[in-house]
Amino acid sequence: MQECPFPENVYRWQTRNDMRRRAAISWRRIWTFYRKPLIFLLSLQLITVVWNEWLAWEWCERLWDIRYADHDQGVHFLIVADPQLVGYREERLPFPSITRWDADRYLKIGFERALRASKADVVVFLGDLMNEGIQMSKAEFNLSLTRFESIFHMPTSTQKIYVSGDNDVGGEHERVIPYLVGRFSRHFITTFDAATLGLQALNFVHVNAFNGATEVLWNSSSSLTVVFSHLPIVKFRSLLQQVRQMLNPILIFSAHEHVVSLYFLFCTECLNSF
């Protein structure tokens, strides 16, 4: 009697089922073995994202020592020094567009929180607004300008003072370039009116320490002068003497070094004039 052969299609079906069953068992074993480490890594990533995107900002903002007087009716100034928007030429990493996006986003979030916490009436930009200002093309400048306006968006009622830096118009490793000075003045327009803030008794002057040029932002008959300069004037004795002889400022705001420093120059005449 001839034995009935085993159907080939049935054999293949059983083989496939066996393979699927073994694969399912293998995945279960893998999941059982790696489940806890995987959950830990995913949780760690989630915590990192939440911390970097929200908790770190909240924590830092609560640590800011911003003091307001009782029934505060003073004028609040917010100083933005050396934001240096990432450019299009020197950033040669594999993904420069991602770098620009991330840096812009970091600046935007920080500025929004600082603006809200300070209740600023005036925002002063102390130069180096763009990192590649002296070498970028017209198209690159226009792109950077659009990014700048998006990052540092503020109410129309907020007054603005713009001071140029060496990355904007030159001056540190090259001469100050007149064309760049003109471009800066055309696109970054100061909208400062001291009278509307009750500061009409003060003089406000911008000093370009790289070429000695001065720009009067607000002029009054008073001898009390506030100076804005990108380069730290107090670090250069001869320059400081010239500025004191010419303007005799009671207060100087500078940037450039990316470090917060306070210098006190006691002036009896200045104190007696209040």
Show the residue positions of the predicted features:
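Short acidic, glycine-rich surface-loop motifs adjacent to enzyme active sites
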Residues: 221-236
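Conserved beta-sheet core of the metallophosphoesterase superfamily
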Residues: 236-274
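Extended active-site neighborhood of metal-dependent phosphoesterases/phosphodiesterases
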Residues: 55-69, 98-99, 134-224, 262-273
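Residue-level marker for buried hydrophobic side chains located in beta-strands
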Residues: 77-79, 125, 162-163, 227, ...
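Active-site glycine-centered loops adjacent to acidic/histidine catalytic or metal-binding residues
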Residues: 82, 127-128, 165-166, 230, ...
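Loop/turn elements at helix/coil->beta-strand transitions in domains of secreted/extracellular proteins
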Residues: 47-53, 73-75, 119-121, 156-160, ...
